[in-house]
Amino acid sequence: MTVQEQIDEYIVGQPEPKRSEMQELHRVILEIMPGCKLWFLDGKDGEGKTVSNPSIGYGLRTINYADGTTREFYQIGLSGNKTGISVYILGIEDKKYLAETYGKDLGKASVTRYCVRFKTLKDINIDILEAAIRNGRKGKSEPGAIATGFLSR
């Protein structure tokens, strides 16, 4: 099964309205990051034990560890969870930046150092989420321009 087929199967397996909202977010992220590398992580470790929610990844970044080793991983992630949807924005160095820059304007969402978690798209300001994703794509802790929204409410 290709990565795109795994992604499609994962999204289709979500209950509504999460399914439609994840399809829309998937489309939007691909518009923001055309031609990016796609990932699908099934949430299982090497022994097949579930250790996290499955996630869709977009883009490519290299993680540098203190011991000198490196690992390739995605820049932006999308995952369904028990209470809604999580968007992961990785690579921003300042751990407070995402919450301080976008948290108060996002709406009804929980924002941590790299994750925006919300119940439904109706609860958040879509333009602000898009700006955070665009900024995360750059991998920098600097304000990104808020572009016109790709998402419809």
Model-inferred region functions:
Residues 1-153:
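Charge-dense, helix-prone N-terminal extensions
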